[in-house]
Amino acid sequence: QKFGFKTGVRYEHTFMNVEYERHPDRNFSKNFDDVVPSAAISYGLSEMSNIRVGYNMRLNRPGISFLNPFRISATPNDVSYGNPDLSTEKSHSISLSYNIFTSKVNLNADARYSFVNNGVTGYSFVDEDGVRNSTYGNYVRTQRTSLSVWMSWNITDKTSFMLSASGSYVDLRSKELGSSNSGFGGNLYAQLRQRLPWKLDFTAYGGYGAPYISLQGRSGS
């Protein structure tokens, strides 16, 4: 059977009921209701290789610290609090992948486009009393195009090579906050293994990770 088709949908209900024994005035609750669809079409090119087109949705629900409305004042002019009206962050992804598995080479290549229309971000504003407020909102729109490759190659009976690499371009925008950022990112990891006499192994490996791109800038590497 060369063609394959799978589809599905699930419903998720999540609830939080947060209670503070010593500070009942800080108690709060939150419910999330989400419908999550998925679909995939695959085609077998041979007994050892296939291509696949798929769609899926991933959920990222905000945690307690993002939702907690209790106000914390670091100074008289600086207050921070969560936003109990936050909704589940939903990432939609469309992918095209190619797989081949042989005695010598295993390879997976994946091209993907994903987008989020309600990403959660922290932001600050100064109110009419001159107090700086720090909280969260579903204000980020993200588009990401990526390509990833994973390969395992048995060069000889005693020599093997593994490669994991990915690259992406991301565009983040927030109309509400008047901010935007974009750029390229990616990571690379490679490993060479050589079996030696006397049951010894020699392994060499290395990698690189590009800085993480967020609405506020870049961080890490």
Question: What kind of feature is each model-predicted range?
Answer:
Residues 1-26, 32-38, 42, 47-92, 113-134, 158-169, 212, ...:
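Surface-exposed extracellular loop regions of Gram-negative outer-membrane beta-barrel proteins
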Residues 44, 48-54, 106-109, 202-204:
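Acidic/polar loop patches that form or flank catalytic/metal-binding clefts of enzymes
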Residues 13-21, 29-31, 59-65, 70, ...:
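Gram-negative outer-membrane beta-barrel proteins
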Residues 22-31, 83-87, 138, 213-220:
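Outer-membrane beta-barrel proteins
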Residues 3, 41-43, 57, 98-100, ...:
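Residue-level signature of outer-membrane beta-barrel architecture
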